[in-house]
């Protein structure tokens, strides 16, 4: 885990340092950025720069989630990674990221929700996180037209879909999980329960299950 900080305390100095005595360095995975963006609206330029800085800080050999509080390797960001491909042309990084998730899959076929896993015992699998793995592989194939991606990951994706069907479904509906749609537009996240009062969990779980089946087919 990488802990976010707002303030730093420095100990052991004999003299009071000035601001010029301190240096901060941004550390992240090496990037190959394609193109740039600028316009006459400085607000848009600032938003673009802040978003790009945030995305860079999220790359630590894998995609980090929630930089402001718990930067773990939740798999969910993988489901939207395709939106980064056109700007961050890093096929080896993205492939390594997908391989990490594949290698962390369990013998029963389940895909963990966090890769690398939390220290100690991994948590139970969750469709809303594990399903991002298949989506990442599929988006990479579409972006780079590399059939070997499908060959490398097909069996693991199939095992994951079979696991959902066997252990998490009642008929065609996914009924087992713990995360849900907790980012309702205009409302604060449901921190205490991680699910929306407006979206049934089974709806989002089953939609992701269906998406994984389409990818597998």
Stretches found by the model and what they are:
Residues 7, 17-50, 56, 63-80, ...:
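Active-site acid/base region of carbohydrate-active enzymes
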């Amino acid at each position: 885990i990488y802990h976010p900080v707002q303030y730093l305390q420095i100990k052991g100095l004999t003299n009071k340092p000035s601001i010029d005595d301190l240096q901060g360095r941004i550390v992240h995975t090496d990037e190959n950025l394609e193109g740039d963006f600028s316009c006459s609206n400085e607000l848009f330029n600032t938003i673009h720069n802040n978003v790009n800085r945030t995305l860079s800080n999220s790359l630590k050999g894998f995609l980090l989630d929630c930089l402001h509080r718990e930067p773990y390797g939740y798999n969910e960001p993988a489901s939207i990674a395709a939106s980064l491909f056109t700007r961050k042309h890093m096929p080896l990084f993205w492939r390594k990221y997908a391989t990490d998730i594949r290698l962390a899959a369990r013998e029963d076929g389940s895909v963990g929700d966090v890769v690398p896993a939390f220290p100690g015992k991994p948590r139970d699998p969750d469709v809303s996180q594990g399903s991002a793995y298949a989506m990442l592989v599929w988006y990479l194939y579409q972006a780079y037209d590399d059939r070997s991606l499908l060959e490398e990951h097909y069996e693991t994706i199939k095992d994951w879909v079979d696991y959902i069907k066997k252990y998490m479904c009642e008929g065609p509906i996914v009924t087992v999980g713990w995360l849900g749609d907790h980012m309702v537009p205009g409302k604060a996240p449901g921190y205490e329960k991680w699910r929306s009062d407006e979206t049934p969990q089974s709806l989002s779980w089953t939609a992701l299950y269906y998406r994984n089946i389409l990818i597998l087919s």
